[in-house]
């Protein structure tokens, strides 16, 4: 069986889920990784692992640092296939180009490491998990609590569905 990864590659808190398909697909059988600039998240929360975003002097260095972090995790787990969430149709703000450039760094490194990439639309992921393609992030979190009795906000120790909970 194979080891797969799912990636939500945002600018402020990229996150990765690693799943070994020899195990049942459940939250507790996955390893989660996220990258944040706040030092308080730079620790392990059971199977959720926070990393500190390295300082950077320009966007290219930022994109390179984040993609190196991600490719290191993918290679450590010998991931050969990744689903990286596609761009949402509503992404029209000025940062859309930065998001695309940032993601291109990672996609290029995955290509160079022979990692297959698929890009499902955000609506596909939401529909799979909640039954509704236009679900909000809180509905995704509620579905996890209802299906698996797992509360990521409680695990990480934050009060609401803000980042990094909403990114995981």
Name each model-derived stretch.
Residues 1-168:
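Phosphate- and other anionic-substrate recognition elements at nucleic-acid/protein interfaces
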